[in-house]
Amino acid sequence: MNQIIQARCEYMHAEAGGIKVFALRANGADTGFLNTLQPGGHVSIIRYPDFSGSPQQRFYSITRMNEPDLFEIAVKRTGHRGVSDYLHSTVKEGSIIPLQYAASTVTVASISNFQRVAMLAGGIGVTLPMALIRELASLSRSGKHVPAVTLLLCFPRVADVPFLHELLELDLTTDWFTFRVFVTREDIQACTHFQPGRPSDQSLEALQQPGAVVICGSRTFAHEFRQRVNHRFPGARLFAESFTPPSSPRESPLASPTSARLLFAETGCAIEADTSKSILENLETNNIPIRSQCRSGICGACRLRIISGNYRFEPDFCLSEEDRANGHALACCTFPMSGDVTIALHATR
């Protein structure tokens, strides 16, 4: 979608853990755009600056739909002076925020037909479970079946946990939802809803046998718990999201810079490649069109094929071992290392 939607901030409020919730109204958006706004999905904020004034594109989770054109996003202040921090500092009621498109990989429809669902989230990754839980609560209030949900959260300190009152109320007033917070950097006594440290294997056993597991957090968090869940619940349907992009390779300050090129199998043309950037970033730098969305190895939109060459990749969340064996890769997770790396942009599944 190329149309830019000018969304108006209707209101905002602060949550714990340096999070601010913004309610945005997609003024003038057509039905096609509005139908893509889904709780648990993402919306693309386009051409919004960071503190250096450089326009950026960022994705934020939709945590609630209030009206067909009014939705909420939750944004965490990071202290890195990026787009999120700039939103915190500059957006007020009436501010205009440009949106490009919205998309969803996990929605309430993905999980509502299971008997039991487990959710694990770290930090701002709580936004995905919150969106899904709110939708399930709405279904439950209307008399519809919802799965039994267990939510495990990881936060450094008790004071960092957002939406805590809402979660407690839901736990104490329904028979289908329960949650537990694991506090990793504060000395606390264990009780019903709070445990010190990270979730142990015994904690995962308390999830019983979920039909589906939702994981959302940093890339490290999502990768770790994806592996643990796959090992413990091999039959469960897994939905994993990460809110941090793949890390670029770290080079020694004394290392000689390496040169690389990307060769295009379809045309035989080539471009110089920066080995500190992903293939996706290199293509964008050279104005070569490629479909992309999440930039985190989740959606699979930037799939391509690696024909040959020296490259490395960060773990993704959507390719199978068979895909990788057939040379498929995600441009956002793959980094050229040296020499010529031949790629086919129009990969077939």
Enumerate the predicted regions with their spans.
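Local cysteine-cluster metal-coordination motifs and their immediate loop/turn environment
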Residues: 288-310, 323-338
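Short, surface-exposed secondary-structure boundary micro-motifs
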Residues: 48, 102-103, 346
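Short flanking/linker segments adjacent to small metal-binding domains or redox-active Cys/His motifs
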Residues: 173-174, 182-185, 337-349
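FNR/FR-type flavoprotein reductase catalytic core
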Residues: 86-254, 261-263
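Ferredoxin-reductase
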Residues: 2-96, 115-116, 155-157, 168-171, ...
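Low-complexity, intrinsically disordered Gly/Pro/Thr-rich segments
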Residues: 8, 227, 318-331
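C-terminal accessory/binding modules appended to enzymatic or scaffolding proteins
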Residues: 257-291
